[in-house]
Design a protein with these regions (language model features):
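N-terminal loops that bind phosphate or other acidic moieties
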Residues: 1-71, 81-82, 86-187
């Protein structure tokens, strides 16, 4: 493996968007890693040129899409990274953004999770493990909705349909936001 710079990674995201636009693709997927990319690829059966390995750089992707739009964007990622995105982070790397567990506890408490347990958790994975499937789905869906709102705010455009998919470590859908009636995406 050959390491490369953050700026080179972001440039590769930009080139991916350029290729998608040059091929008139109506839908691209920005993923934080292989597990979320594999889930989204199976779900939508899109060509490889529609897959953007954004990694931690959701901000770099969204900023470029402001001036280089694609009609439909799916952002797929792990729970922890999308919690950070829902809280306004645009660089999702652990060294550059952290989860506000107190804020997450405020969302989780009405779902039946103990406020102090969530607020004092060491990781989002710990919260996933302490929640039952219904709580996990509800919390992931709330996080997805807030991440979608954060993406829309950062993107500064209303003409791109945005969907958020929260994917578990084992590749299952935990929650989502952005689907409207009859499976169409809300703008």
């Amino acid at each position: 493996m050959r390491p490369f710079s953050c700026s080179a990674w972001i440039a590769s995201i930009h080139r991916g968007i350029d290729v998608a636009r040059a091929n008139a693709l109506p839908h691209v997927i920005g993923s934080t890693g292989a597990t979320s990319e594999n889930f989204a690829k199976k779900r939508y059966d899109l060509p490889d040129i529609a897959l953007l390995d954004m990694g931690d750089f959701v901000g770099g992707m969204l900023k470029y899409m402001r001036k280089n739009p694609v009609p439909r964007l799916t952002i797929a990622g792990g729970f922890g990274k999308l919690v950070k995105m829902s809280q306004g982070a645009v660089d999702l790397h652990s060294a550059r953004s952290q989860v506000d567990f107190e804020r997450l506890a405020t969302l989780a408490t009405p779902l039946g999770l103990r406020h102090d347990a969530v607020a004092n958790a060491n990781s989002v994975l710990e919260i996933v493990q302490m929640s039952d499937p219904d709580q996990r789905h509800a919390l992931a869906s709330i996080v997805a909705g807030q991440a979608r709102d954060a993406a829309r705010t950062y993107l500064k455009r209303d003409d791109i349909a945005i969907e958020i998919l929260v994917i578990s470590r084992d590749g299952a859908l935990l929650g989502q936001a952005g689907l409207g009636q009859a499976g169409s995406l809300e703008l």
